[in-house]
Design a protein with these regions (language model features):
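Bacterial N-terminal signal peptides that target proteins for export
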Residues: 1-11
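Bacterial N-terminal signal peptides
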Residues: 11-20
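The feature marks long extracellular or luminal low-complexity segments
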Residues: 19-422
Length: 422
């Protein structure tokens, strides 16, 4: 490879159906926050299912040493059947490990210098399979969710006659001739700010023609939650329901991804997964990809939010006014494991302050009020009326030093917080 620069009636859900914000561009920097740490959540790749893991990572380390990419760059090469779909799910955090929620991510598809000749499609945006560096073949921009997650369905559209031979294993070298004319691969790089400012991951897939149909028995499948990654720092466990519970801003999209493995522990491709919402009052459907991952994007449209929790691990409200309980299942099977998850939706504010020259900036984060108009008042600053377009929107307010009371009014209800600028 060359150098390459609830209530159920009002819970709406979509399966990978959020419209992209922009498509097709060159390699211009995305311009988001610097030092974003971007990791691949699905498919999960490591030395057991990638080609020449050690040498490829050494290559990536060399690109970092040259200053082309930010530190921590990961480069992995794997395989997928020609004509298959791969659900690429990424998690984005800042350098301190805090999720970068509702942040623009540019998926650079068959990026410049990738030498990729595959025809792939994301959100209806299709590559031409012609590498013309420094230009990417396609770009799709989406927003991360409240947990910093984002997912893209990468569909390969090449003919079987164009595919590479199936490798002996996923740790083998891709099989193609020295002139590379029969090589068929795609290559993706998610970007938040720029190549040097991000700490990202480049993933390359070689498309092969299977020697035989891929069939994985799954009479007792294991269906595990991959995204969001919930633990003791961002969720609580309801032992009675045997599921994890987490808070999310009202009105925001959530990426929910499951991994399905069969009776022998292998990934189950092309299997429909039903996601039962609130006891089966509604059902969402998604099909597992080439690596056994089913990806859902769930959109909340409740109108009566819960109060903001004191922390992400606060007990869930006894009588929640906005929630969604999600449980996966596969028709005709009895799951050995089926991990459910429950989200409780809230509205509230938080404030932080930072030095800006001789003055300070109070950042007022308003959660769960997309589509609303908020009155924002901070001690010593002029009151502002702000139209909110995101489920988590930050309003910057310039102030002088001193103690500040932040008051936000939405639909006649006041939300307050206090900070000290010093």
């Amino acid at each position: 490879m060359s150098k390459f620069r609830t209530h159920i009636g009002i819970i709406l859900a979509m399966i990978l159906a959020v419209s992209p914000l922009a498509v097709y561009s060159a390699t211009a920097a995305t311009g988001g926050p610097k030092d974003a740490v971007i990791t691949l959540q699905s498919p999960f790749l490591d030395a057991s299912n990638t080609s020449e893991a050690k040498s490829n990572q050494q290559m990536a380390d060399g690109w970092v040493a040259k200053g082309w990419f930010g530190t921590g760059l990961v480069f992995q090469v794997s395989f997928a059947p020609v004509g298959s779909t791969i659900n690429l799910t990424y998690n984005v955090k800042d350098k301190n490990g805090k999720p970068l929620a509702f942040t623009r991510v540019n998926l650079r598809i068959n990026k410049g210098y990738s030498e990729a000749a595959s025809i792939v499609e994301v959100d209806g945006v299709r590559t031409k399979g012609i590498d013309r560096p420094p230009f990417d073949q396609a770009n799709v921009i989406r927003l991360t969710d409240a947990f910093g997650n984002i997912t893209f369905a990468l569909k390969n559209l090449d003919l079987e006659s164009s595919a590479e031979p199936e490798p002996d294993s996923f740790t083998s070298k891709p099989i193609f001739s020295d002139d590379k004319l029969d090589r068929l691969h795609s290559q993706m790089l998610p970007e938040v700010s720029s190549e040097p400012a991000d700490h990202s991951v480049i993933t390359e897939f070689h498309y092969f023609k299977p020697k035989a149909p891929i069939v994985v028995p799954a009479t007792k499948p294991t269906i595990t939650l991959v995204s969001p990654k919930l633990d003791a720092t961002n969720s609580v466990l309801d032992a009675g329901k045997n599921l994890k519970q987490a808070y999310a801003p009202l009105g925001g999209d959530l990426v929910v991804v499951y991994k399905v493995t069969g009776d022998d522990g292998r990934a189950v491709p092309s299997k429909v997964v039903d996601l039962k919402v609130n006891g089966g009052k509604s059902t969402l459907k998604a099909t597992t990809d080439a690596f056994g991952y089913a990806a859902f994007t769930v959109k909340n449209a409740d109108t009566k939010p819960n109060s903001a929790p004191a922390s992400a691990t606060s007990a869930m409200p006894a009588a929640s006014s906005a929630f969604a309980t999600l449980v996966p299942e596969i028709t005709g099977t009895t799951a050995a494991v089926a991990e459910g998850v429950e989200f409780h939706y809230y509205r509230g504010i938080s404030s932080s302050v930072a030095k800006s020259g001789k003055d300070f900036v109070v950042s007022v984060a308003i959660a769960g009020a997309a589509g609303k108009t908020a009155s924002v008042a901070v001690t010593g600053a002029k009151k502002a009326s702000v139209k909110l377009s995101s489920a988590m929107q930050v309003v910057p307010v310039k102030v002088k030093a001193g103690a500040k009371t932040v008051t936000v009014v939405i639909d006649g209800k006041s939300y307050t917080s206090k900070v000290v600028a010093k």
